[in-house]
Structure formats: C-alpha cells, structure tokens
Amino acid sequence: MNKYFFIGIGGISMSAIALILKNQGFWVEGSDMQESATTKMLRENGINVYIGHDESHIHGDETVIYTAAISKDNPELLAAKRMNLKIYERAEFLGLLMKDFKNVITISGTHGKTTTTSMIGYILKKANYNPTVLVGAFVKQLGGNFVIGSKEYLVVEACEYVDSFLKFNPTIGVILNIDNDHLDYFKDIDSIKNSFKKFAQKIPTSGFLVVNYDDKNVKDIINQLNTQIICISTKEKTDIFADNISCSDGYYEFDVKNNNDEILAHIKLNIPGFHNVYNALAAFAVASKLGVESITIEQALSEFRGASRRLEKVGEFNGIYLYDDYAHHPTEIKATLATLKKISEGKVLAIFQPHTFSRLKTLLNEFAESLQLADKVIVTDVYAAREKNVFGITSEKLYLKLKEIGIDCEYISNFEDIACYAVKEAKKGDIIATIGAGDINKCLDIILKKAVVKS
C-alpha cells in the first residue's frame, strides 16, 4: 500500500488532499505546528496527526508532501531527503493527482477564486455530477472545504503565487481577473500577466477557458491561444453576459444572456457584492458548457450562501451587524466596503489587519485609498504569514497615511483593546467589519463576548 506523509497537514488545501488519498484507501498521516479544528477533523477521519515537527515521524517508506509555508530546515523534510524518499511540494503533487481525473476545472484570478470554485462545486453537486471539489475555505453547502466524489470532475482553485498553477494539469480553466499582487515573488504586472498566459496555454484544445472580458489585463493575454475561449461580461454583449442588473441592499439580480441576446436564466444572488456577479457568470459559463441545464444552474446560484470569511455575517448585537471578510488586497477591500455601505444605512467601522509586510509596502497608497470607503478605520499589526519584516514597513505607516489624507482612524495593536473600542464606538444600524486574511476574525468573537457582558 502506498503511504503518504503531509508536512503542514492542517492547511486548508493539504488537509483536503490528505482526505482524498485516505478515501482512496491509502495510508495517510501528517504533522502540523498546532492543534486546530482541521487536525481534529482529520483524526476523526482516521488520519494520525502529530503536533510539532520531528524527524522521528518519518519512517522511510512513505511519499512526503509539504506545504510551501514550511521552512527549508524542517526536520521532517530534511529526514525525507536523507532517506531519498519521493518528495513533492503541495502544488506539484496536486498537479500529479489531477491526471487521475477526466475533467479538471481550475479557477484562477487574483480575486474571487474561492467563491467561484464553491459555486461551480455546488452547481455540479446539485446536478448530480458527483464532483470532487477542493476549495480554500469552509463552505457549509459543500459540508466543508472539500467534497470527495468521482474521478469524472475535479474542481479546484488555481493560485498564481510562486507560479503554483503552472504545476497543474487542467482541462478547463477560468481567469476571473489579473491584478497587482504577490509582488514579493513577481517583478511587476507584466510578469503576473505572463504567468497567467502560461496557465491559459496549459488548457488543451479539447477543453475551454472562461475569461472576464471586462478585465483589461485578462484581455491582453487571451490572443493566440489554441483553446476555445468563452468570454463573460457585465458591460457588453459577449458569449455569456449579465443584463438588466439590479441591486437591493447590496444583493444583485440579473439576466444571463448569450451572444444572440437570448435570456438563459435569471439569477438572484443570496450573497452580496457586485463582484459576485462576475463570479456567478463564470460559474454559469463553466456549468452550462458541461451540459448542466440552465434551470439547475439558476436554482443553485440563487441558493448559494457563500464561503466562510467571504463577506460573512457573523452575528449582531443591539442592532449592530458584525461581518468578516478575507479581503487582503486594495481591490478586494474596495469591493467589500462598497458592498457593506449598501447593506446598511449606518456607519461602517472597518478593522483592518494587513497581510504580509511585502504587500503592505508595495501597495501602501492603494490600501489607504481603498479604506477611505469606511466611516472609521482601526488598523492593527501586520499578519506576517510566511515573512519576516525585512521591508522597513509597519502598520503605523498605514495609520499615518490614513491620517494624512483625512481618514478617521485609530491604530490599536491588541485585539482585546480593539474589541473594547469597537463595542463602545458602534451604534444601532452600524456595521463592524473585520478585514484581512490573517486571524483578525478572532476580534469578532471577543466583540460578541464583550457585547453580552455590556448588555
């Protein structure tokens, strides 16, 4: 029996891959730095998880898969190298796994991957296509961050960071948008566009590629591709486009039309935000091309309730609404705040935790500009993730920049202090929103506890 060991098994993607292999009958175990809901769930599914990394965990007869987040001197990785074991980085191994599937649907883009992947997975599940789905967040309607199905359809996010998606073997692709991000790896927007072009070129002539025709950077790269291209738009008549778009309290509905101006469906989204119109169009285009009936797609998209940490309403107290969003790029923050302003007539208090020093340094001015949409901003310390601060940047610089352009803001480092301030500051009808890809959502739990004590 093949054996697999996952270094960093608690990660959202690593855990899903581990469970797929376990479901296929393989021996699987792994390690992670700390206990979590994910490690608990893995154990419940029969996977042994070590807490902490130690060379004794590697027995010498397994294939080792590691996440890019671990250090090069990880003792388990070093032990595997000494033993000359087969070793794969996560994306590389996922690319190999894709060869087992007939239709591999890969969703790329700087923004919107998780939601669109979830939408496509949910549509195919509802249509009884029995898909296997890997998604970068917990999705209630999918029962988690993965669905184990047949080998007919695999639906998976395709991230451009460190060119990960170039290790994939897709048959169907989606490019939602291309924006300036991951500039700790990419030199500039042209190098990002070049990476996406290489990804698009991986789609075989027998497959197809769905692209956002309203995105200039996407438009720049789709020339001279040998695969079938399906264009989506909210602005002009393309292969699949949205028409008669209307909005009520941040929630959108629209007709889906083809390039003959025929109405294919009417979608009434149950998740807020104009950006989700594009995500829904992409999901519609993929599912429709795969033969799912329009009425089934319409029903699924209208039922879809979103993924965790994607404009997620977490709770409320005293008429004050609490939202959490994973936005960690200025474009995403603008979309999030614009949507929140439509949801309630009250003020929006944004609690922002920058994600990585490199991103904050590169996009400092853009972050300041995007946060102007909030009525009040609390900035807290940078969530370092994989980085050390060798960039000479701190959250205080963002705070000072916001002050400089006249934004009502505070810099508060401690989550307890943030919660106290937010509970005191917010009034009935207001929205408190945590924004960032780190652990800033923990603030909302503290806020709810303090609100109960206060009331």
From Swiss-Prot:
Residue numbers binding ATP: 109-115
Cellular compartment(s): Cytoplasm
UniProt-recorded name of the protein: UDP-N-acetylmuramate--L-alanine ligase
Single GO MF annotation: UDP-N-acetylmuramate-L-alanine ligase activity
Entry GO CC: cytoplasm
UniProt keyword Ribonucleoprotein present: no
UniProt cross-references to Gene3D superfamilies, sorted A to Z: Mur ligase, C-terminal domain, Mur-like, catalytic domain, NAD(P)-binding Rossmann-like Domain
Annotated GO biological process: cell division; cell wall organization; peptidoglycan biosynthetic process; regulation of cell shape
Pathway connected to this protein: Cell wall biogenesis; peptidoglycan biosynthesis
Described purpose of this protein according to its UniProt entry: Cell wall formation.
Lineage: Bacteria, Bacillati, Bacillota, Bacillota incertae sedis, Caldicellulosiruptorales
Catalytic activity: UDP-N-acetyl-alpha-D-muramate + L-alanine + ATP = UDP-N-acetyl-alpha-D-muramoyl-L-alanine + ADP + phosphate + H(+)
Nucleotidyltransferase recorded as keyword: no
Record-stated family: Belongs to the MurCDEF family.
Pfam families with a match to the protein in the record: Mur_ligase (PF01225), Mur_ligase_C (PF02875), Mur_ligase_M (PF08245)
Protein EC: 6.3.2.8
Superkingdom of the organism of origin: Bacteria
Keywords: ATP-binding, Cell cycle, Cell division, Cell shape, Cell wall biogenesis/degradation, Cytoplasm, Ligase, Nucleotide-binding, Peptidoglycan synthesis
Enzyme class: ligase
NCBIfam families: murC
InterPro entries, per database record: Mur-like_cat_sf (IPR036565), Mur_ligase_C (IPR004101), Mur_ligase_C_dom_sf (IPR036615), Mur_ligase_cen (IPR013221), Mur_ligase_N (IPR000713), MurCDEF_pg_biosynth (IPR050061), UDP-N-AcMur_Ala_ligase_MurC (IPR005758)
